[in-house]
Amino acid sequence: MKIKIYTDGACSGNPGKGGWAAVILDNNTNQSDVFGSEKNTTNNRMELMAPIMALKKIKSSSEITIYTDSMYVKNGITEWIKKWKLNNWKSSNKKPVKNKDLWVKLDNSCKKHKVNWKWVKAHSGNKFNNLVDQLAVSQTK
């Protein structure tokens, strides 16, 4: 099955109350929205939670395209994570990788699927990016 997922995270204050959201589209026909919040968090943690929680909803191995407006998430999962693992979860400045717990969860969540990551410009008129932005922001209230 081919699935598209749009994700976003938001934070009121950084750190502060955060929200995440994802829209899951299977074969462009069925849409399901997932979203949630955390009390004391950061925008980057919320950006990571959105794809983690969306991937949890997909039970069978699938071909998935995940759209995010976060270069942090896209670059982290497609490029940086390989080096982090080789360097015992240390960043290029030899410090522990921030949000390692969520990077590990996201990496593990991707393993049972064929996942393609795409960056989408925020607030650029994309219907589903706008929707996940609104849902994520609503969770920060």
Write out the residue ranges for each language-model feature.
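RNase H-like nuclease fold core
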Residues: 1-45, 53-58, 133-134, 138-141
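RNase H catalytic domain
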Residues: 10-17, 53-131, 135, 140
